[in-house]
Amino acid sequence: MGKPRGLRTARKLKNHRREQRWHDKDYKKSHLGTRWKSNPFGGASHAKGIVLEKVGVEAKQPNSAIRKCVRVQLIKNGKKITAFVPRDGCLNFIEENDEVLVAGFGRKGHAVGDIPGVRFKVVKVASVSLLALYKQKKERPRS
């Protein structure tokens, strides 16, 4: 049986469409309000935090590597997250108790590639872009 057609079926079609929308993953995600509760950023695109420690995360099979990450405590709500430090040698620019700016890491809130459970990446360290430090365009501010 198909959908009802004809006169006086608008209410039924409208109600059916409203019920079926909840089976759409993107609609459900945007309308349930869970992004405010479960997302450490609270719906924001970036967040500042304090580096607690440097950690190495082992890559998933079949790759073999230790991906350089940092544990960060967010300033806005105190939640602790693990953030990936991109590029070769950039972990050397980050020290404990530094203030870092953290952003999402692609894939709409899921882990990326072979790094298990890491959903964020470091963008800035001590208000200086990590890319600028890497390309030696800027230096870390003296503290």
Curated annotation (Swiss-Prot):
InterPro entries, A to Z? NA-bd_OB-fold, Ribosomal_uS12, Ribosomal_uS12_euk/arc
The question of whether Ribosomal protein is a record keyword is answered with yes
GO CC terms: cytosolic small ribosomal subunit; rough endoplasmic reticulum
Residue segments, region Disordered: 1-28
Compositionally biased intervals (Basic residues): 1-20
Q: Which Gene3D superfamilies does the annotation name? A: Nucleic acid-binding proteins
Q: Which family does it belong to?
A: Belongs to the universal ribosomal protein uS12 family.
Output this protein's name.
Small ribosomal subunit protein uS12
**Gene source species:** Lumbricus rubellus (Humus earthworm)
